[in-house]
Amino acid sequence: GLVIGPYEMNAEAWGLDGIDWSFDNALLPPDTERLEPHLEKVAERIPVFGDAGIKRVVSGPITHTPDGNFLLGPAPGLKNFWMCCGASIGITQGAGAGKYLAQWMVYGQTEINVREMDARRFGDWAAGRYTLEKAIDDYEHMYQVHYPGEFREPGRTKRTTPIYETLKSKGAVFGEVFGWERAKWFDLNNEGEQYSFKRNNSFSAVAEECLAIREKAGLLDLSSFAKFDIEGPDAEAFLNRLCANRIPKKTGGISLVHLLTDLGGIECEG
């Protein structure tokens, strides 16, 4: 026998109005029409498939999150409610997910950084059209070639800063970080970003921008960065303990630091 499992480009969402708790591992009605383009290609590559025919079609739902990573850890806004779901390749990820979820529950942290899977990475903004479009797009591109720094269009412009339109008018090419549109570089030649595993057409433009800021001056839009006010008589000591660098003594001083976990791992940059 030959098993074929394509990720079709005209995917449809299921269960948008909720899923009955009685639904466990049941299957959905077969839909061969959506698979026809893929089946034709299989028959071209493996001619015997065209003569053998199809013995069985298995159709069932599969979960995809907006960024393709599963949801792990404490649920936002709830106490003692833990999540380990949303995995599109759960058989492969299951053992590791269970290990790090157990560490998180028992010790309050994991031995490796699991930020990319942290369920709290999605806020109230990640709902409706955003989640639907991004999840379908992730499914459709499951086994496509993914380039470094690649950002696709579905679900975009969900969160924009006050100067988004100004940056856009100057030729900014945007990426997405936690739903925010963040300028990556400025495409003055209107070429569009040409993704590559090597240096692409953004390299020289980014180099010029870095050189200009280093030797002259520049304005950075940090609106999408999280901001915290730490106050009190022990604020400095607390931050010096938390960060892998010393907090500036000078009022208004700025320093680049890495916030650490109790195990000495890097939680984030600040």
PLM feature spans:
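Solvent-exposed alpha-helices and their adjacent loops that cap or buttress functional pockets
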Residues: 1, 64, 74, 220, ...
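Extended catalytic-interface subdomain
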Residues: 1-19, 35-39
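Flexible loop/turn segments at secondary-structure boundaries
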Residues: 10-13, 61-65, 90-92, 183-184, ...
